[in-house]
Amino acid sequence: MKSQYKKEYFVKNLRKVIRGENLKREEAFNCLKFLLDHEFGIANDSCFGAFFAAIQTKTPTIEEITGLMDVVLNYDRKPLIVERKFSEPLCGIIGSGKDDVKTFNISSISSIVGAAAGGKIIKNGSRSEASVAGTTDVFEELGLDVEMKDKIKFEKALNTYGFGFCDVAPYFPKMLKEYMGKFFFVHPLSYILPIASGVKFDRVVFGLASNATEKTAELLLRLGYDNSLVVAGHDKNGKNFDEISNIGKLKYLK
């Protein structure tokens, strides 16, 4: 598809969304792919923001979000294939971020506790965008080599201690360039993007800073994660945070 046709295709679908119409999975895929390929030059950031804001305003559908995640997981992702020397399932402990309470990165500590208790844990993440501290920030402060790209050392840590940290940046190069650090509002990928990991896990504990647990659970099923726990915590004032709450209401879905 030539560049001019890509622009016309994108504008046509953006107008559909602005009118309140839903996109098909393939249409959502193509639009995000064009954005990640930087097809619109200096206007790319504006197009990206308009596209995400328009979809979020009308309420994103499962088809649309799945199409967007197809780009992230199947087009942009450069997977890290590791050799496991254990039979237990590999669990990802992840959070959506963008919560209202502004806690420190609790899920990072939870992942260490999970591994210490005998679980096999992958913790993926990035630097903070809206929270007090991102996963990468926390582990860097604890002395971990967050930029380690040595596959053998990663495998040794995972097989010896049952824990591996995976900063997302090296494994999603196009997302790193066109997306990271630019979106501070809830958008269509907020419901599911944290499953994007260099190392694919078998099970998921997903902390969500909204009440859309059913939507996230259905998206996890669509993307092949059929053994997952989605949790949405609240504080005593009803504010959302992406953790299991012991200070207010907790909504969860398995």
Q: What positions do the PLM features span?
A:
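Glycine-rich anion-binding loops and their surrounding alpha/beta cores
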Residues: K2-K16, L23, N74-R77, I81-V82, ...
